[in-house]
Swiss-Prot record:
GO MF terms held by the record: triphosphoric monoester hydrolase activity
Record flagged with keyword Hydrolase: yes
Family: Belongs to the dGTPase family. Type 2 subfamily.
Domain HD stretches: 75-196
Pfam families for the chain: HD, HD_assoc
Keywords recorded for this protein, A-Z: Hydrolase
Protein name: Deoxyguanosinetriphosphate triphosphohydrolase-like protein
Membrane spanning stretches: none
Cross-referenced InterPro entries: dGTPase (IPR006261), Diverse_Catalytic_Enzymes (IPR051094), dNTPase_2 (IPR023023), HD/PDEase_dom (IPR003607), HD_domain (IPR006674), PHydrolase_assoc_dom (IPR026875)
Length: 351
């Protein structure tokens, strides 16, 4: 029996009957020989961590554009916090931690530069149905490894596709909107817990809002400190979830659901749409819009940038189609977009 097979047997012996054991994965688009040491989901997690897209998350916006402070979240730190929260919930419920972690680490790989402002630009210039979750699937399926993709398992791909959607329903009842595995559904909740808590923490740290402005009901239920918010929401999910009519349901109590909606509404009205944040996103949208048009009309510049970003199977021959330019823009970090915009559109002193 290999080390991998021992892991798989341990999962079968320990995990909840509602968990997704590695040995029962539906597999990959392109079949591969199994690893003698790692399970399928462990391999997926490792492939994501070693991907270019994952490394680029460190220079992509969470809420505040290119923050100068050392303690503000980036898209990478957000991803790591989601993974930690999701693993904690999965462990408490005897779900597959490796699958949970892989989905959590991959859920934002397709996020645009400048956060959701960048996503709005690509909706307008490329296609109204563009979303960072769909772009994350493109990243792992056909952009990473110079067009080869990461060839992840069906379960991880499904979880990435079904993670939370901004101002949408926290836990929709429609089966088509939630992941097919309990692990994927845990990541959806963990994503929301993470951004509600850390976006509020960053907003208070930056001075965009004060502690006194936070709805008193939210403070009473969740606590004042960042760690109190996270712990309270995690415990509520763990204690509220469980078996119902022969099926496991991932949910929070009605009281917690209402508080989370109240806090999310507060963040949208007072942080995400605050003038100091919105005005910077307006500038970011201008940068990405002009870069999009520039690369659509400059083949050589597009191919050079695609080579730098290590996109496509043959970036030196790639055509600047709308899809390809969208892939290029979405792959950029805030820093790359800013420096490239400056190089292209700002005059260079001759002497």
């Amino acid at each position: 029996m290999t080390i991998r097979e021992k892991f798989e047997q341990r999962e079968l012996d320990f995990l909840s009957p509602f968990a997704c054991p590695s040995a029962k994965s539906k597999g990959r688009k392109r079949p591969e020989a199994p690893c003698p040491i790692r399970t399928a989901f462990q391999r997926d997690r490792d492939r994501i961590v070693y991907s270019n897209a994952f490394r680029r998350l460190k220079h992509k916006t969470q809420v505040f554009l290119s923050p100068l402070g050392d303690h503000y979240r980036t898209r990478l730190t957000h991803t790591l916090e989601v993974a930690e929260i999701a693993r904690t919930i999965a462990r408490a419920m005897r779900l597959n931690e490796d699958l949970t972690e892989a989905v959590a680490l991959g859920h934002d790989l397709g996020h645009t530069p400048f956060g959701h402002g960048g996503e709005t630009v690509l909706k307008e210039l490329f296609h109204k149905d563009f979303t960072h979750s769909r772009q994350s699937l493109r990243v792992v399926d056909c952009l990473e490894r110079r067009g080869e993709g990461l060839n992840l398992t069906y379960e991880v791909m499904d979880g990435i596709a079904k993670h939370s959607k901004g101002f949408g329903t926290i836990m929709p009842n429609d089966a088509g909107e939630v992941a097919s595995t309990m692990e994927g559904r845990v990541v959806r909740v963990a994503d929301i817990i993470a951004y509600l808590s850390h976006d509020l923490d960053d907003a208070i740290r930056s001075g965009v809002v004060t502690r006194d402005q936070v709805p008193s009901h939210c403070v009473e239920v969740l606590g004042e400190r960042h760690r109190d918010l996270v712990t309270t929401m995690i415990r509520d999910v763990v204690y509220s979830s469980g078996e119902e009519d022969g099926q496991m349901t991932i949910k929070m109590s009605d009281a917690m659901h209402d508080v989370m909606l109240e806090l999310r509404t507060f963040l949208y009205n007072n942080v995400y749409r605050a003038p100091v944040v919105h005005n910077e996103f307006v500038k970011a949208k201008k940068i990405l819009s002009e870069l999009f048009d520039y690369y659509m009309n400059n083949v050589d510049a597009f191919q050079k940038a695609a080579i730098e970003q290590e996109l496509f199977a043959s970036p030196e021959h790639a055509a600047p189609t709308k899809q390809n330019v969208c892939d290029l823009i979405a792959s950029m970090t805030d820093r790359f977009a800013l420096t490239r915009y400056q190089k292209i559109f700002f005059p260079t002193p001759m002497v």
